Amino acid sequence: MSRLMLGRTLERICKAVLLLCLVHFLIMMILYFDVYSQRFDIFSRFNNGRGANTSRWPHHSYYNYSRPNATFPSYLPASELLPPSGKPELNRSQPTPKPIPPCPEVPPGLVGRLLIEFSSLMSMERVQRENPNVTEGGKYTPPDCRAKQKVAIIIPFRHREHHLKYWLHYLHPILRRQKIDYGIYIINQLGEDTFNRAKLLNVGYTEALKDAEYDCFIFSDVDLIPMDDRNLYHCYDQPRHFAIAMDKFGFRLPYAGYFGGVSGLSKKQFLKINGFPNEYWGWGGEDDDIYNRITLNGMKVSRPDVRIGRYRMIKHERDEHNEPNPQRFNKIQNTKNTMRKDGISSLTYRLVSIKKYPLYTNISVAIGKPPPRPIRG
């Protein structure tokens, strides 16, 4: 009897264990097929979307961009890991970029005294290779600081291509070291009539302002190269005379009222003197007229130290059709009477073309002819 009871008990236990195993097996199968179908569905969607986005998602690594240390199952599709925009979420509290500081009064990269020579051959291609940061039209803006002024450098010009190559070769690096925000404008007088330097400078002022909002204007002859980069090409509280010590004059100022070669005026100063005279045809006199305009309007000429304001001149013969102006002495004596009616307010010219080259902007103009000289009886 006891054996029969024991056998039935064992039979029930075995059936219970078998039933539990069967239940466990069924649960495992259900879970297995559920996960398999989910994975199949996910990979199907992933592969369907992959064909259109292969170039965008070439790898199978996925990350939580807002939580770098979190992990996810490798089978999750990119659409479930990325935000709705389809792009990684960036930190919305991005740091505000620091404002560009003002350029220092004395830039730290200046060299000082320079060796200037004109014996080596020069080409525009070489100058362009040397100045890759100069943009079209001969413009440059310091990348690491904010210049106080925007400077237009204006050169009166005719038949001086050889000199221009050397000028650009030396001046572009100097101006960049000086942290000048500048543009270079070559004002080319067309035709073979008598040259008029001051009128071309007026044209340069007018045309440069059409191109950009300049507040400082440097007027330079194309044959003068500064020998010291501490001679800073920007405007000052008073009209500035830069070329005070040329090799042509033994590195001395030829006379107290000399204002030739290279000079600079702010826009306000330029307008105060009504610009430059338009009636000085031929060589000489216009610089002295400009000096008179400055002093007659209550301003003074500022100059650098004579050891810094040194210049070398590229030697050349006097240009044809730029003979000395025989009327210059009479005109200089009448500056007070003529400066209000002869200047930027009375400027007339015909603009022929504007061409922007890699190293400068060329502006070709027709400025007319000088009036006929009076016949002496």
Residue ranges and their predicted role:
Residues 2-8, 15-126, 279-282, 288-377:
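C-terminal catalytic/acceptor-binding lobe
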Residues 116-144:
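Short N-terminal or domain-adjacent regulatory/targeting segments
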Residues 132-140, 160-175:
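Short, well-formed alpha-helical segments that are part of the catalytic scaffolds
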Residues 143-144, 148, 155-166, 190-192:
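Active-site beta-to-alpha loop of glycosyltransferases that engages the nucleotide-sugar donor
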